[in-house]
Amino acid sequence: MASPALAAALLAAEGPNASGAGEGGGGVNASGAVWGPPPSQYSAGAVAGLAAVVGFLIVFTVVGNVLVVIAVLTSRALRAPQNLFLVSLASADILVATLVMPFSLANELMAYWYFGQVWCGVYLALDVLFCTSSIVHLCAISLDRYWSVTQAVEYNLKRTPRRVKATIVAVWLISAIISFPPLVSFYRQPDGAAYPRCGLNDETWYILSSCIGSFFAPCLIMGLVYARIYRVAKLRTRTLSEKRGPAGPEGESPTTENGLGAAAAAAAGENGHCAPPRADVEPDESSAAERRRRRGALRRGARQREAGVEAPGPGLGSAAADPGALSVSRSPGPGGRLSRASSRSVEFFLSRRRRARSSVCRRKVAQAREKRFTFVLAVVMGVFVLCWFPFFFSYSLYGICREACQLPTPLFKFFFWIGYCNSSLNPVIYTIFNQDFRRSFKHILFRRRRRGFRQ
């Protein structure tokens, strides 16, 4: 909703004679003189530069969000129901880039509204609808993450594709309710003005209500939700630190979703998949170490058989370290046969030791994942506030104290274009930090390119 709000603020600053009701480039003032299109406030070089920058922003927004949609719909790793939020969010940002930003750019460069009053009303409603929908989607995603952290088991059972789609419909309905007033209350231009303009209702009640509904209320909800998530993460990190040490008799640990302090779920990767083996150990190195352990076990078993020592029981050391040692110590020979009870003890000790190692690994993965998750939340909140807060704060101040609180026009324009940048940054925030999206992007872009080269 930035561009119509900018037009309304500029109309108030320029006075009533700056507005017009014409359809196109000309108008007639109160004295009956015919005016042509107003002179542009930018030089030819500035027009070309601004058009290039905004054009790149539009293309980047469309391409990035289209990649998000394709990745979620085609990648098996991204078919979780909650990723439908990202599809809907990307769709809203694509619509902002295609149906709002080009007309905002034309209105800015030409210094008047060229496209007529009918499209002006539609344009105002679409602007508010898509931008508000983008913000409300971020709010819905934050609530989804909060419930998945605090009510992992119950919420996972409830979070079906049908429920997620119903939530998405509710998001669009809320955005439509907020954006509907511009269709019936957009700025009414006075008769006899020189140039046509397109702006929202300039009354204080509309400015404040739209700012609260489109920004401040969702921002407050997101702040409270992310603060709660951060507190839960800190609490579980502290709990893990206190419990650090040897695992219990069964090697068990608490489990939750999303890796926030859960030992079992923390073994999952960045997107809930099982964590791969250690990446710093190559297969050849692992097999070589395995062969060395087996040779050592063979030598120890041979020495035990020569000495006539019976294989140990539950306190087994070398055999417990490797299944290979167990197979050797079971080989026939004087004093070298394990009893059935000793064999069960060895198997129990081996499984217990494997669980203990797995528990320690899961603790480390959980702590690392909590830090990464907290960082992503900080990026989401920081970019969201950075993009939208300056515009909505200055716009609401203008609605309260008018000219006394009005910012310089160039600064106000900069604030509202920064708000549009949020649509292009959403794919970066929600995908670049995600390995599955990175792999899917590479698969989409480079595999098709290779096919083109082969053909």
Curated annotation (Swiss-Prot):
GO terms for cellular component: plasma membrane. It is found in: Cell membrane. The record marks S210, S214 as: Implicated in catechol agonist binding and receptor activation. Glycans are attached at N17, N29. Disulfide bonds join C120-C198. Residues 1-47, 111-120, 188-203, 401-413 are extracellular. Residues 241-340 are annotated as: Disordered. The chain crosses the membrane at residues 48-72, 85-110, 121-143, 165-187, 204-227, 377-400, 414-434. One of its GO terms (biological process) is regulation of smooth muscle contraction. Keywords: Cell membrane, Disulfide bond, G-protein coupled receptor, Glycoprotein, Membrane, Receptor, Transducer, Transmembrane, Transmembrane helix. Residues 291-302 have a biased composition (Basic residues). Residues 73-84, 144-164, 228-376, 435-455 are cytoplasmic. The keyword Glycoprotein applies. It comes from the Eukaryota. Belongs to the G-protein coupled receptor 1 family. Adrenergic receptor subfamily. ADRA2C sub-subfamily. Alpha-2 adrenergic receptors mediate the catecholamine-induced inhibition of adenylate cyclase through the action of G proteins. This is Alpha-2C adrenergic receptor. It comes from Cavia porcellus (Guinea pig).
